[in-house]
Amino acid sequence: LSKTSINGRGKAKKITPEVLEGTHSYQISTKAKFAFHSFSNYYTYPMQAIVSLPDHQFVNPDQNMIKKFDPSLKKDNPLEFFEITTEDNVTMEGWIVKPKNMDPNKKYPVLFYFYSEPAGQTGQNRFGAGYNRLYNGNLSEDGYVYVTFDGRGTPSPKGREWRKAIYRNIGKINVRDMAMGAKAVFKKYDFIDTSRVAVHGWSG
């Protein structure tokens, strides 16, 4: 969350604590004096708190996210974030979970997880990233690579042109981004077995 002058002068100033790297949402009160703040990242269970605005102070000390936040948990999570640029010069962000105890001489099968439409993102830094609740086990421990990235048309903070790119083009531009993105992932991570590729997605 950021604040700026109502006259448009000066630069916007971020008021969300820098240490809380991840995904945030705010429900702001009518007079904008308070907000219900939600936060999580890939290694932090969701937290909620009431904060005052514009100073972003935690109204209830027991809900102080900064004190509860434990960055040391990061080291125990195998998820990594990445950025790729496709042959179409489209840059996309996502995450990858590599197999546990990887053998550098082996290649591993990959499961892509996609949505790539306006209702949401899959590549966010939020709790649950890197896990597939439909899989009865642990993909990483079972020797699979698990990957997602957000293509054009998703509500990524990349501006109107990005979000509106698939207007009247659903199933065309976003599907191409998935295909070209997969090629870029194969090029970036040479331990992926390109003969063993699976794709899972939702309504997109």
What are these regions (language model features)?
Residues 9-17:
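Blade-edge beta-strand/turn elements of extracellular beta-propeller
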Residues 7-9, 21, 119:
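Feature targets compositionally biased, intrinsically disordered low-complexity regions
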